[in-house]
């Protein structure tokens, strides 16, 4: 079962990216490296509820 999630950068508070994940395969919070236009570099974005 796939669910839609929002990715947030904790330090800047940006919530830029929407993606989906399979809850059965990845029960933990997802962390992905994405580009932050505010900081102009790649940073870690974490799943928020």
Swiss-Prot record:
<dbReference type="GO" id="GO:0003735">
    <property type="term" value="F:structural constituent of ribosome"/>
</dbReference>
<dbReference type="Pfam" id="PF00471">
    <property type="entry name" value="Ribosomal_L33"/>
</dbReference>
<dbReference type="GO" id="GO:0006412">
    <property type="term" value="P:translation"/>
</dbReference>
<dbReference type="GO" id="GO:0005840">
    <property type="term" value="C:ribosome"/>
</dbReference>
<dbReference type="InterPro" id="IPR038584">
    <property type="entry name" value="Ribosomal_bL33_sf"/>
</dbReference>
<keyword id="KW-0687">Ribonucleoprotein</keyword>
<dbReference type="GO" id="GO:0005737">
    <property type="term" value="C:cytoplasm"/>
</dbReference>
<dbReference type="InterPro" id="IPR011332">
    <property type="entry name" value="Ribosomal_zn-bd"/>
</dbReference>
<dbReference type="InterPro" id="IPR018264">
    <property type="entry name" value="Ribosomal_bL33_CS"/>
</dbReference>
<dbReference type="GO" id="GO:1990904">
    <property type="term" value="C:ribonucleoprotein complex"/>
</dbReference>
<protein>
    <recommendedName>
        <fullName>Large ribosomal subunit protein bL33</fullName>
    </recommendedName>
</protein>
<comment type="similarity">
    <text>Belongs to the bacterial ribosomal protein bL33 family.</text>
</comment>
<keyword id="KW-0689">Ribosomal protein</keyword>
<dbReference type="InterPro" id="IPR001705">
    <property type="entry name" value="Ribosomal_bL33"/>
</dbReference>
């Amino acid at each position: 079962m796939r669910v839609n999630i929002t990715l947030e950068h904790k330090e800047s508070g940006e919530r830029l990216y929407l993606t989906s994940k399979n809850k059965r395969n990845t029960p933990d919070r997802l962390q992905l490296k994405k580009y932050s236009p505010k900081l102009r570099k790649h940073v870690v974005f974490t799943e928020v509820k």
